[in-house]
Design a protein with these regions (language model features):
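C-terminal amphipathic alpha-helix
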Residues: 38-93, 130-194
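Mature extracytoplasmic domains of secretory-pathway proteins
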Residues: 96-137
Length: 194
């Protein structure tokens, strides 16, 4: 009788250990899957932000010189430069409006990157810091593309300074960005070519 009770208790203990072990394994697998999904989301956000940096840089380098040229030409022709700038702004409106949409997306991508830094600072901290600097520069460039301000001279000085900052931060980002993010950027570029 005692042997039956001992074997019964051992059987129950073995079953309980097996159930607990299975539960722990399932939790570990679930946690690993969630971590992998978060990592994929972080890489995607970093890649999209990088791609959007390039788009915003293109818009700024395309739009700002056109404002300057229209402004300068209006002054040379003794016309109201406000009218000339407004007309140029109107002709570039769809591009400038699209840059506002891109800029809004970048805010969310930067927020996702801040989550990535909290979870994996060794991988994302340097890139996130450079992204924040770039975001500040892009904010100023966006403001100038939406509403050029100052005199022609100060506008040109400001635009040139901002474009130089953009190039500097872009170079820093190119060094800091990891290969998996670069690969994802290439996928985004291919997808957007279609």
């Amino acid at each position: 009788m005692n042997k039956k009770i001992i074997w019964g208790i051992l059987g129950i203990v073995v079953i309980m250990i097996a159930l607990v072990s299975m539960n722990v394994l399932q939790e570990n697998a679930k946690e690993a899957k969630e971590k992998k999904e978060r990592e994929a989301r972080y890489v995607q956000a970093a890649a999209e932000f990088y791609y959007n940096i390039e788009l915003m840089g293109f818009v700024a380098t395309f739009v700002l010189p056109q404002y300057s040229e229209a402004w300068s030409k209006a002054i040379d022709d003794r016309r109201d430069f406000n009218v000339a700038i407004h007309a140029k702004r109107k002709s570039l409106n769809s591009m400038v409006a699209q840059s506002s949409v891109i800029y809004s997306d970048m805010e969310g991508q930067l927020k996702t990157m801040s989550e990535a830094v909290k979870e994996n600072p060794n991988k994302y901290k340097e890139l996130y810091d450079e992204y924040k600097k770039m975001y500040g520069t892009i904010t100023s460039l966006k403001e100038q593309t939406e509403s050029p301000s100052g005199t022609l001279v100060t506008f040109n000085q400001n635009a040139n300074m901002l474009l130089q900052e953009y190039k500097k931060y872009k170079g820093n980002i190119d060094v800091a960005v990891s290969q998996d993010i670069k690969n994802e950027v290439e996928k985004i570029k291919e997808k957007n070519k279609k």
